[in-house]
């Protein structure tokens, strides 16, 4: 029940272009142990929900951001502080950090994005992709 309540009360963010900065969010969720509250001996499951594609390493050049993602925590007051300082993380960096931190990612995505995230899940060890209904009412079932 607590999980369902937390999902209903989750903060929803957006982006100005079609692809999202979800990789930045994933990286911070994975590496910010204390800020997120990951416990030492818990099973770590990260559900990433979206209806859009993603930005990855190299896309930051379009906005003049060329410093590679360093894969460390940059959160203050629950806000990511380096979105204009460093590029989005690469798929390989996300995979490395997910393996280091023993985190399982479920990409809960809409039908239109499922093929992309299914392919992505093949490159992020232990992750999987599932289809999220258009109104997200099946997220708890995933």
Where are these regions (language model features)?
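Divalent cation-coordinating acidic motifs and surrounding scaffolds
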Residues: 1-142
């Amino acid at each position: 029940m607590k999980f369902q309540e937390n999902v209903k009360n989750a903060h929803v963010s957006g982006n100005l272009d079609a692809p999202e900065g979800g990789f930045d969010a994933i990286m911070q969720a994975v590496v910010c142990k204390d800020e997120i509250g990951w416990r030492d001996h818990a099973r770590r499951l990260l559900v990433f929900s979206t209806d859009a594609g993603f930005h990855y390493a190299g896309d930051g050049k379009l906005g003049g951001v060329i410093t590679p993602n360093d894969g460390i925590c940059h959160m203050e007051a629950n806000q990511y502080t380096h979105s204009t300082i460093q590029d989005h993380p690469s798929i390989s960096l996300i995979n490395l950090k997910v393996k280091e931190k023993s985190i399982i990612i479920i990409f809960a995505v809409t039908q239109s994005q499922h093929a992309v995230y299914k392919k992505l899940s093949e490159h992020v060890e232990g992750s999987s992709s599932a289809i999220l209904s258009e109104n997200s009412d099946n997220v708890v079932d995933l």
